[in-house]
Every structure is written in structure tokens, then in C-alpha cells.
């Protein structure tokens, strides 16, 4: 009986081994987490510089941005695809218009009472062996320094004024008229005012910056500066209109100054091509059949948002402070990541895809972040 029972148990064990289904496969391991980097590391500062260079390059309007400090930096190393950096950058507006295409090293930040500052979030792809530098996405938010802060530091300094104010337009048109009268060989028309401040000197004074374009009209036409044409802006002018008491006292004497800087001619429309530094975009094959999870793009996705000055309410004690520079940048919300087709950067038959993760928050930031400021903002 015991032998029979042992025989039955052995038979059952053999059947279970033979017919047991294979063990379920292990779930795929999640993508490697983002690694925090020091905000003053040489690699991080170099990548931040490339990112801002690309952001400036694709703009068609406004002023170039310069780096004040790296606020946060993470990296995702991706085997043969190189690295994808996630950067949060504190930036300052310079006095160089984006159409000037000047080297960023030649563009300093504005004087403190004209300060415009903010933050950019950027993703930047680096593949050193393949000599690829690429900006897939960015977003920036900028604000001017508040009038209250300017007044507390320098009560008599110029302060910003509405660009559409009649006195601002008067300063722009009269200073441009002066420039045209002193340069009769070619006439220029006003495109738009880009900056304006006011100050009381010996009377009301206005200081303006504005874009100009070539005008088909002649010097004898008084409305030349307001005539429309399809030509692109060719330069940036700085003008001033200072009014001082005249004779009789009810009238003002006007003093007008102007200087204009002309842009170098561009062979291509700014921002119209692929900003990858090491690639000729006109020769790059572009795919348009990629699935939604891996869109094929050449120009970076992003924008620069200008917000009004932020005033601190008098009864703000005990309240949570408002986020000064709200910036969102998410190519995906999938915590496991999605893929981004960057095959056009590599010119190879097989597809090349980057893994893109949600933009990181403040958690697990490097203790070396934020980095040191280059210029203290008011």
C-alpha cells in the first residue's frame, strides 16, 4: 500500500512539471531616473549656454536672453543616444534685439531700472560622438522689475511706460524724423516701439527703442514714418524726447536725440529652420509618419511669455507667495516616459528615438543648486 501511494505521488509530480505553464515574464524595468547635476558644473554651464543660444536663435521678436544662473539641472543618460538634459535657467534680458544676431557674449544685461528677468525650462539633447546638439523643447516666462522696487532704489530713475502712450509715439516719430533728415539718401519707417521709459529731467522726458524698416517714400513726405510696407525690420533705433520750459512758459522746448543700429542681412528667416547646431536643416530628411507618441519635429516647441510686473500686496504677510515665473514644460505626463523621434538629426536608415520623461520638480535637486548669480536682480 505504501509503495502504491508513493508511485501515485511521483506520477502526479511528473505531470505537474510537464504541464505547468511557463512563469509570466518579469515586467519591464522602469527607465533610469534622472540624475541631479551640480548647477555650477562645467558640463551643465556649457549645455545651458547652448540651450540659450538655440532659444535666442529661433525667436523672431524681442530681445536676447542671457544666463544669470542655473537654477536646477538633471540628466538622463541613454546608451548610444547620448544624454537628454532637463534645465531650469534664471535669465536676464539683454539690450540686443534677436534680429541683430549678435554673439551673446557681446550682449550685456540691461541697467537695473530696465531689468527684465525670468526663468526658462529647457530640454537639450547632446550626443558627443555623433556631434549632435538639439533643443527639443523650451518655455520661458519673463517679468519686468516692479516700479515700486525701482522707486525704492532710485526715486529719480526712469521707469517703464505704456508703449502705446501718445507721448511714446511722439518720441519715436520725432526721433526717426531727425534720423531721416540727417540721412537723406535712404528713408526709414517705424515698425513698432519695443521699449519705452519716462523720467522728469527739466521737464517730461521719454526714452524709446523701436524697430525700423526701409521706406519707399521720399524725404518730402511727412507721413513716411507711418507708411506701411512689406519689408522686414532692418534696424533698431534709440531715441529720446526731452521737453524743457520755453518762452512763453506754457510751451515746451523739445530736445531730440537718435541713434540707429542696423542688423546684418540674414539669408534665412529667423527661426524658420532647424536650430541643431551641427546640422544643415535644408539637407535633413524629415519624417511625417511618426506615431503620436514619437512625433517627428525639427524646430523646438516653445515660447517666451511676457507677464506684467509683480507687485507684492501690502497685506501679504502669512500668505503663500505667488509663483513669480510660472513655467510649464511637459512633452509627456507618462512617468515611464515616451519616445521622441529624432531620426532627422542622424541621417541614418534606422530610427533614432529619445526617451522623454516628465519635467522634474524640486524633489531630489542637487545640493549644489541653484548656482551663483552673475547679477543680483532688484
Curated annotation (Swiss-Prot):
SUPFAM superfamilies attached to this UniProt entry: Cystatin/monellin (SSF54403)
Record flagged with keyword Chaperone: no
Cystatin fetuin-B-type domain mapped to chain residues: 28-141, 152-261
Keyword Transmembrane: no
InterPro entries: Cystatin_dom, Cystatin_Fetuin_B, Cystatin_sf, Kininogen_Fetuin_HRG, Prot_inh_fetuin_CS
Cellular component per GO, a single term: extracellular region
Known tissue expression: Liver.
Glycosylation sites recorded in the entry for this protein: 40, 139, 289, 292
Disulfide partners: 96-107, 120-140, 154-157, 217-224, 237-260
Main location class: secreted
Region annotation Disordered: where it falls in the sequence: 266-338, 357-378
Cellular compartments annotated: Secreted
PROSITE patterns associated with the record: CYSTATIN_FETUIN_B (PS51530), FETUIN_1 (PS01254), FETUIN_2 (PS01255)
Listed GO MF terms: cysteine-type endopeptidase inhibitor activity; metalloendopeptidase inhibitor activity
Keywords: Disulfide bond, Fertilization, Glycoprotein, Metalloenzyme inhibitor, Metalloprotease inhibitor, Phosphoprotein, Protease inhibitor, Repeat, Secreted, Signal
Basic and acidic residues: bias regions: 362-378
Its biological purpose: Protease inhibitor required for egg fertilization. Required to prevent premature zona pellucida hardening before fertilization, probably by inhibiting the protease activity of ASTL, a protease that mediates the cleavage of ZP2 and triggers zona pellucida hardening.
Protein name stated in the entry: Fetuin-B
